[in-house]
Amino acid sequence: MQYSRSVGRLIEELARLPGIGPKTAQRLAFHLVTAPREAAESLSRAILEARDKLVFCRVCANIADENPCGICRDQNRDHGLICVVERPRDVLAVEKAHGYRGLYHVLNGSLSPLQGVGPEELNIAALVTRVREGTVREVIVATNATVEGEATALYLARLLRPLNVRVTRLAFGLPVGSDLEYADGRTLARAIEGRREV
């Protein structure tokens, strides 16, 4: 179908977002161009504000409004427990489960030699530093149940075990090959409770 150049460009840009296919991009584009101007401006401001004001926490590497983030500063959380996740969106998935009260560490990916992602490209050195500080007693590896996630979990277990810290992995019940962010809260809470040694 032929669109005006502006609508076509908007559809292309929306379709570049994860999880947005061509049909959804088309629906969103037509909604935005037919909505009141204030709605489009409000969305535009929210996107720019998020890009300009959000930071990566210097402790855990999660996306935050402050540095360090609210989770790392919360004294009611268990600072001896660190849940390692691949992406910031995985922190949100674990938090929604309401069963975890420790801290986090975001790797910003997983090991994938075929795509050129090795330990140096991930936020692993900062995790080792946190564990070496001596206050961490357990690291829960909550990487995705994919080949890359499993490889990352095994690598972290071998790396951290000599540092006298317990290294556990989420229990299964999470579908193999799926991303953590798509798990429902109850399944994720059970996986945290049933975690196992790696």
Curated annotation (Swiss-Prot):
The cysteines covalently paired via disulfide bonds are none
Keywords in alphabetical order: DNA damage, DNA recombination, DNA repair, Metal-binding, Zinc, Zinc-finger
The UniProt entry, under InterPro entries, shows: DNA_Rcmb_RecR, Hlx-hairpin-Hlx_DNA-bd_motif, Rcmb_RecR, Rcmb_RecR_Znf, TOPRIM_dom, TOPRIM_RecR
Q: Which residues form a coiled coil?
A: none
* GO terms of biological process kind: DNA recombination; DNA repair
Q: Which PANTHER family match?
A: RECOMBINATION PROTEIN RECR (PTHR30446:SF0)
| Annotated family | Belongs to the RecR family.
Q: Which NCBIfam families match?
A: recR (TIGR00615)
Q: What is this protein called?
A: Recombination protein RecR
Native organism is Desulforudis audaxviator (strain MP104C)
Q: Which gene encodes it?
A: recR
